[in-house]
């Protein structure tokens, strides 16, 4: 997805920044050593110190949560948002889906080993506690700039009702939901990438 957006930006002579959160992908550090607050700070640092002018933020899954947090922290520097299977406040759902045994282990040891999509990683109790402190859907959020939420109906990670849950809390007059019938959580098929780029173009035109 990021490479597709980068190609789109270059083709249309747009400035483009992409980065992976610490503990993800090729970035330094281990996942278990960071929290939502750490990653929020990283994104805000990029907006404050690297980006020039108002930005269109594109956030996928957890990145969709960070996108909202950054927009709330720096509203004058964010011109619009495009969420790809955006998952704000997913911590509660993650915790509730754990077995009682895993919850017990988390509370006793302070961490658990968790597997998802073939990857195993460590989740610490501080990650859960910090995530709850960074909720955005526990109160109304005013946003009178473009917000487009793209959601695959075959996504088995972020449920299809999540975009509606988001827009009930985000108040504004430029909010859209795009439901893609045959798309999954990755949103990486050619049709998905085309829709993502079209939505970015739409957000730019409204500025």
Where are these regions (language model features)?
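Catalytic histidine neighborhood in serine/cysteine hydrolases
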Residues: 170-186
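Short alpha-helix in the alpha/beta-hydrolase fold that links the catalytic acid
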Residues: 2, 145, 159-168
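Hydrolase active-site cap/lid region
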Residues: 76-123
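Short beta-strand/loop motif that positions the catalytic acidic residue
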Residues: 143, 149-151, 155
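Acidic catalytic loop of the alpha/beta-hydrolase fold
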Residues: 154-158, 186
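Conserved alpha/beta-hydrolase
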Residues: 2, 6-28
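Alpha/beta-hydrolase active-site loop
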Residues: 33-50
């Amino acid at each position: 997805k990021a490479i597709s957006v980068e190609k789109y930006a270059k083709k249309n002579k747009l400035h483009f920044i992409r980065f992976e959160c610490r503990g993800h992908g090729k970035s330094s550090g281990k996942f278990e050593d960071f929290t939502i607050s750490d990653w929020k700070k990283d994104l805000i640092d990029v907006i404050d110190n690297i980006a020039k002018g108002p930005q269109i933020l594109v956030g996928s899954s957890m990145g969709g949560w960070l996108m909202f947090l950054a927009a709330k922290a720096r509203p004058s520097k964010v011109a619009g948002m495009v969420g790809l299977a955006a998952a704000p406040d997913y911590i509660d759902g993650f915790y509730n889906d754990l077995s009682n045994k895993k919850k017990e282990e988390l509370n006793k040891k302070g961490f658990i080993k968790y597997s998802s999509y073939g990857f195993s990683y460590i989740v610490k109790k501080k990650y859960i506690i910090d995530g709850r402190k960074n909720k955005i859907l526990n109160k109304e959020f005013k946003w009178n700039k473009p917000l487009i939420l793209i959601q695959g109906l075959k996504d088995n990670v972020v449920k299809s009702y999540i975009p509606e849950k988001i827009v009930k809390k985000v108040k504004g007059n430029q909010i859209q939901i795009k439901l893609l019938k045959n798309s999954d959580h990755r949103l990486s098929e050619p049709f998905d990438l085309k829709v993502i780029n079209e939505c970015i173009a739409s957000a730019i035109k409204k500025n």
